[in-house]
Every structure is written in structure tokens, then in C-alpha cells.
Amino acid sequence: MSINKEQILDAVATMSVMDVVELITAMEDKFGVSAAAAVAVAAGGAAEAVEEQTEFDVVLSAIGGNKVAVIKAVRGATGLGLKEAKDLVESAPNATLKEGISKDDAEALKKSLEEAGASVEIK
């Protein structure tokens, strides 16, 4: 009688955790392999793929129609003086407003600047 993969998986699914551990140990002994090495390689690759960006930069791409409102929004968000905020806004496109901030902070800053009429990117 030939057993297919699906039948084996069904049988393993009904086993307790301890039974599965014993099965793995028996398979390692019988075939002379180690499941730990394969698991470590698979887990290492998965960890790299799962890494998520945690720090974001907010970049002013365009000022829009209401330059004064954008300067006020930049001033409020960055704590810069009027002249520094004006110079920063006028350096758009690609004026980095804040670097290395959380996603929530970046989204909030983007929203406030877009409400003022600016075009903003989060990188």
C-alpha cells in the first residue's frame, strides 16, 4: 500500500506536540540529518524578508498654491524660526523636513502639510 503526502500530513496533524517531536527525532536518527540546520536557514531568510522600515523621512516635493500656510505648517512641525522655515520651504522640491521619525509622526506631518497645500513624500 502506497501512502501519499496528504495522508502523512493528516496523520501528523492529529499527533500531539510531543509525538511530533519524537517523530522528528526518529527521522533524524534514521536518515542521519538534522532538522535544526534547515529550520535555522529558513528562519534566517524569513527574518530578513519580514524586516520593516521603522524610520521615515518627510520630504517636501512641492509648495503648492499657499506658500504662507505651508511655511506656518513647517514652522509648527519643526520648531524652526520664520526665516529658517521659509528657506526650507523655498528649497523644495526635495527639501527634507524631518529625518528618522516614526511612521505615525510622518503620516501626521504629511497630513498637516497637505492640508496647507503642499505635496509631501514619505521615504
Curated annotation (Swiss-Prot):
Coiled coil: none
GO cellular component entries: cytosolic large ribosomal subunit
Gene Ontology annotations of biological process type: translation
Keyword terms of this UniProt record: Ribonucleoprotein, Ribosomal protein
Any one GO molecular-function label of the UniProt entry: structural constituent of ribosome
Subunit annotation: Homodimer. Part of the ribosomal stalk of the 50S ribosomal subunit. Forms a multimeric L10(L12)X complex, where L10 forms an elongated spine to which 2 to 4 L12 dimers bind in a sequential fashion. Binds GTP-bound translation factors.
Family, per entry: Belongs to the bacterial ribosomal protein bL12 family.
General function of this protein: Forms part of the ribosomal stalk which helps the ribosome interact with GTP-bound translation factors. Is thus essential for accurate translation.
Listed name of the protein: Large ribosomal subunit protein bL12
Lineage start: Bacteria, Pseudomonadati, Pseudomonadota, Gammaproteobacteria, Enterobacterales
